[in-house]
């Protein structure tokens, strides 16, 4: 591929507003700093409108929801739409509880998302496709993952990103399949949450017409950083991988993305 967005991200250092969960907040902030963005972590409803006007992108992550969070998410999302910055939804464990289901439905009804990023089980639920999930984990299903990505992208007029052993990215017409990564990703908590934040950072430096390409590069960059970090590690070195991932996000170059990205288009 021809990396275009990583250099822009590091030059512009976009401010990314994260309404995320208590498990992921620290890791997401450090990961954004590593790749070249500037994170701000706030779910305080009193400052949501101002945050949207200060930021270049917004991530809404439902991982550890409270009632107050929902109000803040809705206000932040609607204000972000008004000022014209991209919004990413990470519907963590959406199928697990009624509260998550109702919250996600409300968000999708009232906020226009630029991208929705989750695992296969989460996006299958949003697409209305039968899937067996386990809490916030992907679970298993017989449906075609590429078709799920297309369904979500078309239904919500956004870019759908389904992450897993293979990542699927769809804008409703085009489909990219990314084959980088490492089995260590699902062994550390919040690796998907950080990916959503990275997606938001890449969208922050892209024109709307280029969102698909920006997310293909952003997801590839993240997966390649993980792949490089895992090269000298055993399958049980979770802690070393966590630190190594941050190091590789910081040192990753456009040339490495171009060299190592394994992408197919349909």
Swiss-Prot record:
For the protein in the UniProt heading, the enzyme class is transferase
**Which residues are involved in binding substrate?**
41, 190
Q: In which pathway does it act?
A: Cofactor biosynthesis; thiamine diphosphate biosynthesis; 4-methyl-5-(2-phosphoethyl)-thiazole from 5-(2-hydroxyethyl)-4-methylthiazole: step 1/1
Q: Which cofactor does it need?
A: Mg(2+)
UniProt-annotated binding residues for ATP? 117, 163
Catalyzed reaction equations: 5-(2-hydroxyethyl)-4-methylthiazole + ATP = 4-methyl-5-(2-phosphooxyethyl)-thiazole + ADP + H(+)
MF (Gene Ontology): ATP binding; hydroxyethylthiazole kinase activity; magnesium ion binding
Single GO BP term: thiamine diphosphate biosynthetic process
Q: Provide the alphabetized UniProt keywords.
A: ATP-binding, Kinase, Magnesium, Metal-binding, Nucleotide-binding, Thiamine biosynthesis, Transferase
One Pfam family of this protein, by short name? HK
Superkingdom to which the source organism belongs = Bacteria
Identify the InterPro entries for this entry. Answer: Hyethyz_kinase, Ribokinase-like
Q: Give the EC number.
A: 2.7.1.50
Summarize the protein's role: Catalyzes the phosphorylation of the hydroxyl group of 4-methyl-5-beta-hydroxyethylthiazole (THZ).
- Family, per entry: Belongs to the Thz kinase family.
Among NCBIfam families, the record links this protein to: PRK09355.1, thiM
Q: Which HAMAP family match?
A: Thz_kinase
Q: Provide the protein name.
A: Hydroxyethylthiazole kinase
**What is the species of this protein?**
Histophilus somni (strain 129Pt)
Q: What is the lineage of its organism?
A: Bacteria, Pseudomonadati, Pseudomonadota, Gammaproteobacteria, Pasteurellales
This protein's gene is called thiM
